Amino acid sequence: MNQSPSKNYFTMPNEIFSLGLDASEIAVYAYLRCLENRSTYQCWPSYTTIGNAVGRAKNTVMRYVDALAEKGLVSTEPTSVLMRSGIKKNGNLRYTIRPIREAIEIFHARQLSAVERAAERQ
């Protein structure tokens, strides 16, 4: 059994635990990290596939993906599939895992903005 060890595990940045994510957001992020192509940082799972992996409904996964995108952890873009009949259909989203540094900067900027707004109110 000569398997590449990099296919049996994935890494998670330690900073993920300091960004105020709830457990389900972390689970969705971890699943996307697990599936990502380590050269392109991209993957294409369906909402249903993600939901089955993390034990959440499709609509709930959609909300978590939106939250991860808003927090700068992932970006998404629609894809399309050309069927044999020639009909073009919507495909799964293409997820790109963003550098953790970007998410940390967004998190700190939002915290600073909240502190400034609170100071203005006083």
What are these regions (language model features)?
Residues M1-Q122:
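Electropositive, intrinsically flexible nucleic-acid-contacting patches
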